[in-house]
From Swiss-Prot:
Superkingdom, taxonomy of origin: Bacteria
Keyword Protease attached: no
Cellular component annotations (GO), alphabetically ordered: plasma membrane
Keyword Membrane: yes
Annotated organism of origin: Paracoccus denitrificans
An example Gene Ontology molecular-function term: heme binding
Phylogenetic placement of the source organism: Bacteria, Pseudomonadati, Pseudomonadota, Alphaproteobacteria, Rhodobacterales
Pfam families given in the database record: Cytochrom_C
Protein name: Nitric oxide reductase subunit C
Keywords: Cell membrane, Electron transport, Heme, Iron, Membrane, Metal-binding, Respiratory chain, Signal-anchor, Transmembrane, Transmembrane helix, Transport
Length: 150
């Protein structure tokens, strides 16, 4: 083999390396998809109430201020583990009451404090939103966020 890389050798290394890394990327993409569909998320827990809660989350643009499992804005707290932080992850009725009470009692007009808007949700919407947040607490995030405070 010669000491100098020829144009043909360089081309072959480029194409071979490109194909190799495209195959690796494809395999990792498939692996991530399979993991997300089979292990990370328990779809058996996706009740109509959880799905409706997700729609309420999207309709009210909660992600514009909050993060959910690290995705979203960092203006307000992470909500992926909020039910665990509040100590109501295993009690749906307490989760509903806690979420409703907290959202309805938001203090207003405090100077220098970030303010969450009042959404005027119905009890059914509060229940669905709390079910959605309870469901997000069951997702295997591999210990993300790294602290309990979100």
């Amino acid at each position: 083999m010669s000491e100098i890389m020829t144009k043909n050798m360089a081309r072959n290394v480029f194409y071979g390396g490109s194909i190799f890394f495209i195959l690796i990327f494809g395999a990792l993409t498939v692996h991530s998809h399979i993991y997300a569909r089979t292990k990370a998320v328990d779809e058996s827990q996706l009740t109509p109430s959880v799905v409706e809660g997700k729609h309420i989350w999207e309709r009210n643009a909660c992600i514009d201020c909050h993060t959910l499992l690290g995705e979203g804005a960092y203006f307000a707290p992470e909500l992926g583990n909020v039910m665990k932080r509040w100590g109501v992850q295993d009690d749906p009725d307490s989760a509903f009451e806690t979420l409703k009470g907290w959202m309805e009692s938001m203090p207003t007009g405090i100077e220098g404090r970030r303010q969450m808007p009042r959404f005027d949700l119905t009890d059914e919407e509060f229940r669905a939103l709390s079910d959605f947040l309870l469901w997000t607490g069951t997702i295997n995030t591999q210990n993300w966020p790294p602290n309990d405070a979100g």
